Each structure stands twice: as C-alpha cells, then as structure tokens.
Amino acid sequence: MKITAKLTFTLLLILFITHGAAEERPIRIKAVGDIMLGSYHPEGFLRPDEKGSILNYIRPVTQDADITLGNLEGTLCDSGLTDKCEPDSLDCYVFRMPEIYGKDLKSAGFDFLSMANNHIGDFGSECVTKTEETLDINDIGWSGRPGTYGSKTIRGVDIAFIAFHSGGYCNSSLDMETAESLVSNLALDHDIVLVSVHGGAEGLAAMHLPDSTEYYMGED
C-alpha cells in the first residue's frame, strides 16, 4: 500500500519580539501544520521500510530555512495502549508513530515541534514522555505540557518556541492571562518568541470565526 504524507495547516501564530538582531540578514522561518507520518494503530498504516523516509519528498523545502517548525499530530512511541476509541470505530482516530521517525524529522530540518494538540495524549502519559525524550535525543525543541517551551540559539539569535492548545494537558490557549505571562517572560531572555496555537473547528461550516466562544465536537 502506498502511503503519502499530508501536511495540513493548523492555526499558527508567529510572534516576533526583538531586542536587536545579532546579524542584519533576517532570520528565515518556515512552518507546516499537522505532521503524521504513519501509525502503529490500527495495523497496516506504516510505510514500507524499503521506501525510505516519507519526508524525503519535502526535505529540500523544509531544510531551506533558518528555523523550521510544525505540529506533531501524534506520539513517537514504540509501545502503548489506548482506550480513546472503540475497536471498530470509523470516526475516531489515534496516532502512534515509531520512535525511529524522530531521526526523519531531524534530517528533514525541523528545529521545533508542537506537542500541544488533541492527539498527543492518545496513548497516555508514558507515550507523551517517550515523545519528549525522542525529540530531545534528536535535538528538536518542543512545547506541549503546561509551562514547557523550546529554546535554541540560531545564527547568534536566541529563539524561544511555545505551543498552545485548548486541552487541559497543554499550555492552554483558553487561559489568556497565563499565556500572556508565559510569552512575556520568554521575551525577556530571547530575541524572538515563536507562538503556535492548535485549535479551531474544521470543515466548510467553520470557515468564519464566530464573535463568541467557538465549540467543536463538544469542546471549547
């Protein structure tokens, strides 16, 4: 079975807070949305090993930047159980990618990845921790759990990355006071702060934001 990658855009906000750049040439940033490279669950949704990395096709694009970031829509975890979906469900999805795919993300040029989304907890806290460890091993900055952020110095510029989602297990996009405090504190020690927000309803009926609280599938 031929497996293709689909990188879809989520709501991504990039906030620049500068205190004097180390060089005159601008920092070039590229961002993609949801990244899901195949899943152990259900069976049969992993790429054939002999095909090589599915990211090979986009590597020339994602490598061509000073900073590349995206939203990791699932865990990097070789084992783990889930009770999120019924066994025969056709409208419930859980994603668990092999840990080895962390190397593919690194070779594709990703510097920061958001773990603040509705699929990072599909296989429980152990797989969240394993994903964090896998990204650390591959020197990819990440942000997800409350209070977490990534930090790198690139071309002499100190850069922070923080990600938000409406779920209670992430930096909350609904708690604006805390979000503002987190970003402001990062700005004190960094030249650039990148802010990623994963949220919003999907589908044709959600093309315009309401002037009120938005709900999707029962969630705020």
Summary of predicted features, one role per range:
Residues 1, 21-23:
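Intrinsically disordered, low-complexity Ser/Thr/Pro-rich tracts
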Residues 12-21:
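Hydrophobic h-region of N-terminal signal peptides that target proteins for export
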